Amino acid sequence: VGSEMCIRDSLNNYVNLYPGAVTPQQWGGVTIFPFGAGAGFHGIPGDVTPPSRFVRVAFYKATAPVCPTAYDAILQSFHILNNFDIPIGIEHALGKAPDIPSATQWTSAIDLTNRKVYYKTAYNNNIRCISMKKIDFDKVKYQSYPLDKELKQPIEEIIVK
């Protein structure tokens, strides 16, 4: 009961938020318009604290479309999770960041039905997949691999002719 109350109380602070557009309003004979699409979410917290990230993910998840395929659901998951990457240095005073960054080091999503784990890292935003179906857990002993072969984001150059 306590955690449910905490969740509800956190979200109650944002009862004024809703998905979609805000309708223009008349104020003293002047029509005022929203700044852009999605203005119904104006006021959603944007800082990197856990409570603010929780509120954002709750609203993003609640308004996400139902995906027709597992592939679409994984891509939608990463679109939502992209909003929660914490850049290196933002959590510390200027010049005080530790050697081990507390920034987002990897992001993952899991397809439980197809037994696949997807991930991307701070060094490579390409989504990678590990199929658990292809691993014979009776034969394979514990192993570990680096998440990245190289700590460098590949960039594809587009040549315009």
Region locations from a protein language model:
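Short, small-residue-biased leader/transition segments that mark boundaries at the very start
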Residues: 2-6
